């Protein structure tokens, strides 16, 4: 049981490291889909990677990265909503 927890922790830390060094979430999720068998562990990894990836867009500090991300994924303009980057959903208020 301890070995399974250690492997899970190492997988999670590895995926977080990959997602924080410039890889897009879709690339890291693809690695999870390819190498982790279906089940609770896979679902937990995917949810954890998604949460970490949503915090990596630099909102509201780096607004241009949010736009770049949305243009890359959905070909829409990106807008910072607090710490979240939302594609094609403009703010109803001005941040700066």
Swiss-Prot record:
<dbReference type="GO" id="GO:0090729">
    <property type="term" value="F:toxin activity"/>
</dbReference>
<protein>
    <recommendedName>
        <fullName>Neurotoxin beta-KTx7</fullName>
    </recommendedName>
</protein>
<feature type="domain" description="BetaSPN-type CS-alpha/beta">
    <location>
        <begin position="56"/>
        <end position="93"/>
    </location>
</feature>
<comment type="similarity">
    <text>Belongs to the long chain scorpion toxin family. Class 1 subfamily.</text>
</comment>
<keyword id="KW-1015">Disulfide bond</keyword>
<feature type="disulfide bond">
    <location>
        <begin position="66"/>
        <end position="85"/>
    </location>
</feature>
<feature type="propeptide">
    <location>
        <begin position="22"/>
        <end position="29"/>
    </location>
</feature>
<dbReference type="InterPro" id="IPR029237">
    <property type="entry name" value="Long_scorpion_toxin_alpha/beta"/>
</dbReference>
<dbReference type="GO" id="GO:0015459">
    <property type="term" value="F:potassium channel regulator activity"/>
</dbReference>
<keyword id="KW-0528">Neurotoxin</keyword>
<dbReference type="Pfam" id="PF14866">
    <property type="entry name" value="Scorpion_toxin_alpha-beta"/>
</dbReference>
<feature type="disulfide bond">
    <location>
        <begin position="70"/>
        <end position="87"/>
    </location>
</feature>
<keyword id="KW-0632">Potassium channel impairing toxin</keyword>
<feature type="disulfide bond">
    <location>
        <begin position="59"/>
        <end position="80"/>
    </location>
</feature>
<comment type="function">
    <text>Inhibits voltage-gated potassium channel.</text>
</comment>
<keyword id="KW-0964">Secreted</keyword>
<keyword id="KW-0732">Signal</keyword>
<feature type="signal peptide">
    <location>
        <begin position="1"/>
        <end position="21"/>
    </location>
</feature>
<keyword id="KW-0800">Toxin</keyword>
<keyword id="KW-0872">Ion channel impairing toxin</keyword>
<dbReference type="GO" id="GO:0005576">
    <property type="term" value="C:extracellular region"/>
</dbReference>
